[in-house]
Amino acid sequence: MTQPNPNKQSVELNRTSLYWGLLLIFVLAVLFSNYFFN
């Protein structure tokens, strides 16, 4: 079993984790803004 390009898979994984991190930061920013502006 040989993978054609294992580096591509790791890059996709890092990109997905990066998107989840940005989404988490965005949600936390919205929650904090709602908390401070109420």
UniProtKB/Swiss-Prot annotation:
GO terms for cellular component: chloroplast thylakoid membrane; photosystem II reaction center. Keywords: Chloroplast, Membrane, Photosynthesis, Photosystem II, Plastid, Reaction center, Thylakoid, Transmembrane, Transmembrane helix. It is a single-pass membrane protein. GO terms for biological process: photosynthesis. It is found in: Plastid, Chloroplast thylakoid membrane. The chain crosses the membrane at residues 17-37. It comes from the Eukaryota. Its main location: plastid. InterPro entries: PSII_PsbL (IPR003372), PSII_PsbL_sf (IPR037266). Belongs to the PsbL family. PSII is composed of 1 copy each of membrane proteins PsbA, PsbB, PsbC, PsbD, PsbE, PsbF, PsbH, PsbI, PsbJ, PsbK, PsbL, PsbM, PsbT, PsbX, PsbY, PsbZ, Psb30/Ycf12, at least 3 peripheral proteins of the oxygen-evolving complex and a large number of cofactors. It forms dimeric complexes. One of the components of the core complex of photosystem II (PSII). PSII is a light-driven water:plastoquinone oxidoreductase that uses light energy to abstract electrons from H(2)O, generating O(2) and a proton gradient subsequently used for ATP formation. It consists of a core antenna complex that captures photons, and an electron transfer chain that converts photonic excitation into a charge separation. This subunit is found at the monomer-monomer interface and is required for correct PSII assembly and/or dimerization. This is Photosystem II reaction center protein L. The gene is psbL.
